[in-house]
Design a protein with these regions (language model features):
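Phosphate-handling active-site elements
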Residues: 43-47, 212, 238-252
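Short glycine-enriched, charge-decorated loop/helix-capping segments at active-site entrances
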Residues: 61-68, 130-136, 164-168, 220
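Conserved phosphate/ATP/ADP-binding segment of small-molecule kinases
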Residues: 135-211
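Short, small-residue alpha-helix embedded
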Residues: 160-161, 221-245
């Protein structure tokens, strides 16, 4: 994929642009909805191509209902977007893809354009789903999207899947993040979240030159819907505005922590992150 040393040209009257290729989550807590709210909150003009529609089923213990967008419809969305902003759109986030066919469609579209930043949130399953749901997308994501990424934000499960390592400590998380960077060449923000022992939520940033542990006290004892989506979207927005990868990681961590502290409660098993937490 072509890469250039493009310098973002934007202001309050001409904001930076960012595209998310992701799924819709009906309650507004995660997915493309979270991405667009994050972009808007951080002063970036958000654009979306939908890959799937996901909804919780209140009659079935809030399990996920998953409806893939046909690949030809995804392609039509991407054609419209890339035709409308051929010069200015240089930053993209990849979220929930949902199937190998969709992954291949997204990857082909990315290869047809030049990008400064490709942020991969390597979503293999929706929050609350069993790991087995990841099996059919795992290999396609590694083969098609990871090589295109300039930055990736795997959670604990995804870090283990992408690195092939078991992660039980901060040291393990650091080693796994290094491994993912070696495989992909991308900057990595590996998220320990609630899964590592201790009082702090620990993430590890690795870009080949820098290794930095980003740590802050845990808030609550359970995960929050939209935290991973919003973290990757915040990284994307900051990169679109011209931040370095490390600056983007630090600011995204702060953004998500503030949103978790003011999470929106509903009847689903997970509260939803509030993107306005830093106001």
């Amino acid at each position: 994929m072509p890469q250039t040393a493009h310098s973002p040209q934007h202001s309050a009257s001409a904001p930076a642009l960012a595209l998310t290729i992701a799924g819709s989550e009906a309650t507004g807590g995660a997915g493309a909805q979270a991405d667009l709210k994050t972009f808007q909150e951080l002063g970036v003009f958000g654009i979306v191509a939908l890959t799937c529609i996901v909804s919780f089923d209140p009659e079935d213990d809030w399990n996920h209902r998953f409806f893939p967008v046909p690949t030809e419809i995804l392609q039509q969305q991407l054609d419209a977007i890339q035709g409308d902003y051929p010069e200015r759109l240089r930053t993209v986030k990849l979220g929930m893809q949902g199937s190998p066919e969709v992954i291949r469609t997204s990857a082909a579209a990315l290869r047809r354009a030049e990008w400064d930043h490709v942020v991969l949130d390597p979503v293999l399953i929706c929050k609350g789903q069993e790991p087995g749901h990841a099996l059919d997308t795992d290999q396609a994501l590694k083969a098609e999207l990871l090589p295109l990424a300039t930055f990736t934000t795997p959670n604990h499960f995804e870090t283990e899947q992408l690195s092939g390592m078991t992660v039980r400590s901060v040291e393990d998380l650091t080693a796994a993040a290094r491994r993912i960077h070696e495989i992909s060449g991308a900057a990595v923000l590996a998220k320990g979240g609630m899964h590592l022992p201790g009082p702090d939520a620990v993430d590890v940033f690795v870009d080949g030159d820098t290794v930095e542990v980003l740590s802050a006290p845990k808030i609550g004892q359970s995960g929050v819907s939209g935290a991973g989506c919003s973290l990757a979207a915040a990284v994307t927005a900051e990169l679109a505005k011209g931040a370095t990868t490390l600056e983007a990681a630090r600011r995204a961590k702060e953004f998500v922590r503030a949103g978790i502290a003011q999470a929106v409660e509903g009847r689903t098993p997970f509260a939803a992150l509030w993107q306005g937490g830093l106001r």
